[in-house]
Amino acid sequence: MKAFMDKDFLLETPTAQHLYHDYSAKLPIVDYHCHIPPQEIYEDRRFENIAQVWLGGHQVLADGSDYYFGDHYKWRVMRSNGVPEEYITGDKPDRERFQKFAESLEMAIGNPMYTWCHLELKKYFGYEGVLNGETAEEVWNLCNDKLQHDPKLTVRGLIEQSNVAMVGTTDDPIDSLEWHKKIKEDPTIKVVVAPSFRPDKVLNIRKEGFADYIHKLEEVVGRKFACANCVVSALEERLEFFVEMGCRASDHGLDYIPFTETNAEKATAAFKKAMAGETLTKEEGDEYTTYLLLKLGALYKKHNVVMQMHYSCLRNVNDKMYRKLGPDTGFDMIAVTDCSATISSLLSALTKEDACPKVILYSLNPADFDMLGTILGAFQDDEIPGKIQLGSAWWFCDTDDGMYQQMKTLARLGLLGNFIGMLTDSRSFLSYTRHELFRRLMCNLIGNWVENGQYPNDEKALKKIVEGISYYNAKRYFNL
């Protein structure tokens, strides 16, 4: 029997162990998509206890509204174990909340959360044991002592000891990027903290709050919008500002990726109707969103900004809890959508105008991996190897099986050697161990192919592939 999560954890062959320890493990991390707040990087926040880091909590904003923040992966684990909500997002003491989580984690056999937590405890706190209800007090005291006193466990310390080269935050076009500016001007901060341009609220024309958001965008750029091209012009202005602040990527969170025949007149008609408070049909909404995606794609190409598109998620499906806690609190699910024709049509339209940027396609539904894998090959060109990417196994797919499936699909239908690798998509500064888990699985997969005689034991070629997927492909892709 193997020891619990030892140095060769998940590395089943000597080749896998060699590839991981000698090539992959030592390389920097390019965390090109996450949700961590840049303010906490600049202020070098120190957390008081492990519950604050892992479970987050609740605060009342200046306008009196409630805001719930934290790791909703962990919140779902606790809810699945029957833990009352007051211990999850409520105001119960942190020690009691941590106890409930530890008791829940014990039941999470096979869940990636179990692996993530123990990798974090081992890497950042030197804890070699097992977290459960009985050891919760021991772990609580150990972690809190280190969090409060260890200079390596401030936010910047965590980033530095994790060997992070780049952090790609997620930012709204109306954001002032004040913290990115301060970070950029601070010579003591070595990591690249790059804002990512996420204009979801501009594209979601049929969702509640669209008109209110457009008014906020008008205030930021200092003019009113009479047409769809006015919106595009404002977005270009904001994108140029983001690029000045170091932006390397955009991000689009879409229920589905639309495409329909459209033009400026159709998009403007839909825009005016929405601003008047009228209800749009799906076709009208798609005409507007398609038009903006085409215009934005061309702008991303012009400014060398990567276009990320995430889709196939049904969000906030528990209406009662959504109204109580708001979005991003653990009440989303995988959707079944057929976007094969629309994605290919969108990329084709952009390519026809020589306006297709670098694109990363993520589906929350693993059933889409093969379809996306075949789309990639239809739109690659000589701008850069792997210009169109199959996004890393995302969210509910971020499991051992999900990562293996994504990598095997890419290997089977494209070039795994040009894959830009892992991202955390996280709100936690301890989550960089997810890159370790990915690298172990990647080296194990490649190691097994070599040991089985499916790829030669060519040291030079294997080194290039493993180091590329771990770091160098992303470094090139995001112009670091």
What are these regions (language model features)?
Residues 313, 318:
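Hard-cation-handling environments
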Residues 1-303, 355-357, 361-373, 377-480:
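Metal-cofactor-binding active-site regions of metalloenzymes
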Residues 336-343:
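Divalent-cation-assisted or electrostatically stabilized phosphate/pyrophosphate-binding catalytic cores
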Residues 43-44, 320-322:
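Short secondary-structure transition/capping segments
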Residues 346-352:
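Short, basic/hydrophobic alpha-helical segments
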Residues 322-334:
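Active-site loop ensemble at the mouth of alpha/beta enzyme cores that anchors a bound cofactor
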Residues 307-309:
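C-terminal amphipathic alpha-helical interaction region
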